[in-house]
Amino acid sequence: MTREDSIRQIENYPPFNEQEEKDKALILGWISNNENAFSRENTVAHITASAWVVNKDRSKVLMVYHNIYNSWSWLGGHADGETDLLSVAIREVKEEAGISNVRPVSEEIFSLESLTVDGHVKKGNYVSSHLHLNITYLLEADSEEQVSVKADENSCLLYTSDAADD
């Protein structure tokens, strides 16, 4: 998928609510005004891709306890120059959860959001506060497949039907 294809996919995404409407405009504006929007070399804001991973019968979602944010989250990460954001989301799930059998429920965008990232230390270097302009896809995985922690990014992964209870 080219940069133009990604822009078109975002343009065609129907916002679910006012937050998504505003974030969609922000994301499209940022991409059009920043050649390096898909790279974390842009230290103000950059495109990220995430996955809302459900099991086969759609009764559970895979959540990760993120080390930097100290909170439960869905899986995802930096585009790092890649413009095929669905591929980025799939790659991040495989890397962060250690699973190989993951597939898109749909190739369309599931949600989009602008996420604030507080300043933090990563690999011994300070990273200033910035924005993740995030595109999320709905993926499916086999909840029987063993998940594994990626220690430099997360400390726990689990399938849950109610993340608030865990």
Sequence positions of predicted segments:
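Conserved small/polar residues in nucleotide/adenosyl-binding loops
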Residues: 137, 159-166
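Short, well-ordered beta-strand micro-motif
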Residues: 53, 138-140, 158
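Conserved Nudix-box catalytic region and its N-terminal flanking loop in Nudix hydrolases
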Residues: 59-100
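A glycine-rich, hydrophobic loop/mini-helix early in the fold
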Residues: 39-71
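Acidic, metal-coordinating catalytic segment for phosphate/diphosphate chemistry
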Residues: 15-50
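Predominantly extracellular/luminal regions of secreted and cell-surface proteins
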Residues: 1-23
